[in-house]
Amino acid sequence: MATLAAAPWFRVRLIPELKNSQSLLYCRGNHSYRQSLCSRRRSFSVYASAGDGGDVRVRFAPSPTGNLHVGGARTALFNYLYARAKGGKFILRIEDTDLERSTKESEEAVLRDLSWLGPAWDEGPGIGGEYGPYRQSERNALYKQFAEKLLQSGHVYRCFCSNEELEKMKEIAKLKQLPPVYTGRWASATEEEVVEELAKGTPYTYRFRVPKEGSLKIDDLIRGEVSWNLDTLGDFVIMRSNGQPVYNFCVTVDDATMAISHVIRAEEHLPNTLRQALIYKALGFPMPHFAHVSLILAPDRSKLSKRHGATSVGQFRDMGYLPQAMVNYLALLGWGDGTENEFFTLEQLVEKFTIERVNKSGAIFDSTKLRWMNGQHLRSLPSEELNRIIGERWKDAGIATESQGIFIQDAVLLLKDGIDLITDSEKALSSLLSYPLYETLASAEGKPILEDGVSEVAKSLLAAYDSGELSGALAEGQPGWQKWAKNFGKLLKRKGKSLFMPLRVLLTGKLHGPDIGATTVLLYKAGTSGSVVPQAGFVTFDERFKILREVQWESFSTDVPLSAGAVTR
């Protein structure tokens, strides 16, 4: 996909030089100084609050390891709405540092689904921008630059522990019923020890020095004050032994160098904030405002997953949902404007959205309500657009020979009230074109029709068809049908349900459906206009009356068991 090519790397914001006053919070400098400071490293307290001022810049940063989940789509939407409401920028960044799971196909699928949904990004893949590139896999040189700066400042040190040593630390911690945190084996190593391991070619990681006591607090725009005890966090890795940076380090560097002002993301990322805040402090960057959105839950209040049905945007698109309905519904999962209104366009959401009205409690995903909402949006479309969407669907499905025209317009008008999803239109038209007369007459619901003398109505209806009287009336459209039905009722001395229920069964083969007059006129026109594919299961008027003529009414007697021949043609 040419439009998804990497953006040029126009500009990268470099970190300022770290000041001694900041770095005194960490062990740094030469060995003797480091030993002295480390011995006094007992307590650390910082209140992490975002820098004020500047333009609003938010980002959505999906990992291309699968499809765009509705939870991710909602996060993207909230970021977009906040940016537009504040006159800011919405940035899309691809976090593809998981080399084993990230694929180009997944990235393209995510971008395609997000484009279909509607929130347009201002910077990112396919668009570019001055803070690119916008794929983490293309920013490795930047991560290494910052890792080296942290190493030089003493905020990071080389750790030569093997996997076996790390596993042993975990086992000991487990036996002592302690958190499985790194013990700091290489945190206070001498320069001679480090040089010796480097000379031997021992693999190493970069570990970030974490104060052993104290706490860290942030002001979350949704959850309020959130705090962590630092003694629960050991020195953590920011760069693996293969030179690949770790997620939390990449995210912090990217958000800082892309001038992200607000980080709006799912609450499952809240634990990552502790590590990221420490890295921000070490690099001397002002922190963004954080807002952690609650998870989307299944009806049983568990985390929404594949076992609950469709969960990705692409699945809902393929099922026949409209993007505007998805946007409307996702916005209401955890947000509301304080009124009873449930229907919003994307433009209206931009006008109404505030982060203060986002709830901290989990939102239940109700697929039934989503389907209902989609039907409301579908039926509110301008008739030209609705005809185009459904007409194309019918043609692509091999039911209609054309995607537009009088037949399409009339069929959409007749059937739209029973269509909630675009895909429902196929079943609706196929059902309309079918003629399950025998099945209906043989059903329990068909018994009252038989008892009401439907066979006598059938004889008169056949006579009207054979004479050309019915066809002539239907050729005139709805007015012709109404005039004919009125006269037909007088002839049989029937009216209302007594007239139209047997007519519905005899003409459509069904007990229920849309207006019988409009249905009959449409079926007649379908047979004369060539608008329906012959192989689409359409039973023409000639075929219907042929079937009707062959019905053995005595076989449907309520006092006699039905024979096999009575329910088959």
Curated annotation (Swiss-Prot):
Lineage: Eukaryota, Viridiplantae, Streptophyta, Embryophyta, Tracheophyta
SUPFAM superfamilies assigned: An anticodon-binding domain of class I aminoacyl-tRNA synthetases, Nucleotidylyl transferase
Coiled coil: none
Organism: Nicotiana tabacum
Subcellular location: Plastid, Chloroplast; Mitochondrion
Pfam families: tRNA-synt_1c
CDD domains listed in its UniProt record: GluRS_core (cd00808)
Protein name in UniProt: Glutamate--tRNA ligase, chloroplastic/mitochondrial
EC main group: ligase
Binding-site list for L-glutamate: R59, F60, A61, E95, Y247, N248, F249, C250, V251, R265
Record family assignment: Belongs to the class-I aminoacyl-tRNA synthetase family. Glutamate--tRNA ligase type 1 subfamily.
BP-aspect Gene Ontology terms: glutamyl-tRNA aminoacylation; post-embryonic development; reproductive structure development
